[in-house]
Every structure is written in C-alpha cells, then in structure tokens.
Amino acid sequence: MKIAVCVKQVPDTTSPRRLDPATSRLDRSGEGAINATDINAVEEALRIKEAHGGEVVVVSFGPTKALDSLRKALAMGADRAILVSDEAAAGSDLVATSYALAKALERESADLVLFGQQSSDSDGAVLWSAVADRLRRPLVSQVADLGIDGATVTGKRQTEFGYDV
C-alpha cells in the first residue's frame, strides 16, 4: 500500500507572528517547523505501513525552506519526500495549492492520502477537501481512528451526537 501524506512548513508557533508590510502576507522569514497535526498524519501513515507494509511518501508545496519539514518526516520513517516548489507561487491560495498538490499526488498513484487536521498558520482546515475534489476521491475528515482491512478503509470520528464510522 502506498500512503501519501501532505505536510506543511509553518512558522514556529513559539516565535511572534508578523505580517510582511510589503506583501500583506504572513512573514515566514523566521524559524519554521512541520505543522503539528501533519506530524500526527505522518505517524498514522507509519503505523499503517508497519501493520500492512507498503511505502510512505510525504508531499509538500512551498518554498525550499519546506525541505526542513520533509526531512523531519523522513527522519520519522517516511520512505520518500516530494517538494513542489516555485518562487512565483509564494502566498498561493487554496485553488493553486490544491491544484499543485493534486497533480503531485496523481503522479504518485497513492492508495491512501492523509492530511493533518489544519495548519497552525491559517487554520483553514479545507485544503484536504479541495485536493480530494480535484482527485475525485472520497473524503473522510476529522478521523480519530483509522482502520485498514484489505482494500477497505474505515474511519471513526467524534461528532456532537457520538461517533460516526
């Protein structure tokens, strides 16, 4: 089973955040780190790989600085890393980011694609749905427990009414 995990390099949450006055975007010149919930997704992919075999590929779209996050995922045990990068894409919106990630994921032909809950720099929590839509693949979000049985994937998520499976 090939599992792709999308990860994002975000500003270190322990340093102050500022807007770049020239671009009105988040200043990303300081220290960066792999997004915290993406670490959870990498760990889940590695757990699945350990139980069922396969390959874990981490994918990121961003500046070359994002290589730091990819290296962290490789150090955790991921097999390969892919960085999609273009300086002209700095500050890309949801549409451009989902397009770039979907194209990279199409080339990988992953059996399962995982994302973290949301990024700590924007709290958007919608990129995964845009990528799933572009890939024309089913989406299960907010998953707290993931199960694999052959070619069947099940997810359990908590709602205000209990659990959905």
Where would I find each of the regions flagged by the language model?
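N-terminal glycine-rich FAD/FM-binding segment characteristic of electron-transfer flavoproteins
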Residues: 1-165
